[in-house]
Structure formats: structure tokens, C-alpha cells
């Protein structure tokens, strides 16, 4: 069994990372805590603490703009792309999710930003992409 700890972050797909960072820092007065490319996912991320959770700005870094974030923006426009909850055991969360009948995109944890193990629940199961 696993324990859900908190909402970890809200992933926001954006076309222009610098413009988005400027809004969150200069307009909302927040600070960026880290910027990281995750080439295996074709994305660059920036985390921005906001109270008890994080905002994660996501921009496509693939050559043709056809990574997951580029495809998301092409289909849906910019905006909330996923919500992430922190759990104490990612594999147990995957196993329980499958056991309860929800569809997983990932059947095993994979590497994410900040060295975290991540996995995604298919949005058809829960109404939004859930990490």
C-alpha cells in the first residue's frame, strides 16, 4: 500500500518559457527555484514555489516541436497540462491504480525532473493527466 502525501505541483504547458517566467516572477512576485532540461521527455522545466505547492512551467525542446508538450499545445493550447501528487511509493501507486481499474500510461516509474521517479495515469481514467 502507498500513501498520498500532497499535491506536489501543477504542470503548465507554455510556448515561451522566458515570457511565462517573467509573468510569474514580475507580475505575481514569485521566484524560480530551478530550470532543467529533461531530454528523454523532450521538455524543459522551471519550478516556481507558490505556497505549499509548485508550479511547473513546461516547454517543448524537441527539434520539430513534436514532443509531449508540443503536441499538447498544438491540440489544446497553453495551460494546465497535468497535476502531480506526491506518494511515498510510486510502484505501489501504479500497482494499486491498475488493480482498481484505471489506465496507466506508465507501468513502471521513470525518471522525471529533479531526479524524481514519476508515472502518469491516463487522462481518460481520471479526467486530467495525473502524475
Residue ranges and their predicted role:
Residues 1-18, 78-87:
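N-terminal beta-strand motif that seeds the catalytic metal site of vicinal oxygen chelate
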Residues 1-3, 46-49, 56, 85, ...:
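Vicinal oxygen chelate
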Residues 19, 37-41:
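Short glycine/proline-centered loop/turn elements that form peptide/ligand docking sites
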Residues 20-22, 31, 53-57, 65-67, ...:
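Short loop/beta submotifs within extracellular cysteine-rich repeat domains
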Residues 20-25, 97:
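Conserved active-site tyrosine of GNAT-family acetyltransferases
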Residues 29-37, 101-108:
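Short secondary-structure junctions
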Residues 56-81:
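Helix-adjacent hinge/juxtasegments
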Amino acid at each position: 500500500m502507498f500513501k498520498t502525501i500532497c499535491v506536489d505541483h501543477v504542470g503548465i504547458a507554455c510556448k515561451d518559457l522566458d515570457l511565462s517566467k517573467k509573468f510569474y516572477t514580475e507580475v505575481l512576485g514569485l521566484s524560480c527555484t530551478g530550470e532543467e532540461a529533461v531530454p528523454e521527455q523532450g521538455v524543459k522545466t522551471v519550478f516556481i514555489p507558490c505556497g505549499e505547492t509548485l508550479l511547473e512551467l513546461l516547454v517543448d525542446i524537441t527539434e520539430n516541436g513534436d514532443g509531449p508538450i508540443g503536441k499538447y499545445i498544438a491540440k489544446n493550447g497553453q495551460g494546465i497540462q497535468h497535476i502531480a501528487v506526491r506518494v511515498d511509493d510510486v510502484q505501489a501507486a501504479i500497482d494499486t491504480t491498475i488493480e482498481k481499474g484505471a489506465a496507466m500510461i506508465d507501468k513502471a516509474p521513470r525518471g522525471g525532473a529533479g531526479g524524481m521517479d514519476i508515472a502518469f495515469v491516463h487522462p481518460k481514467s481520471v479526467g486530467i493527466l495525473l502524475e
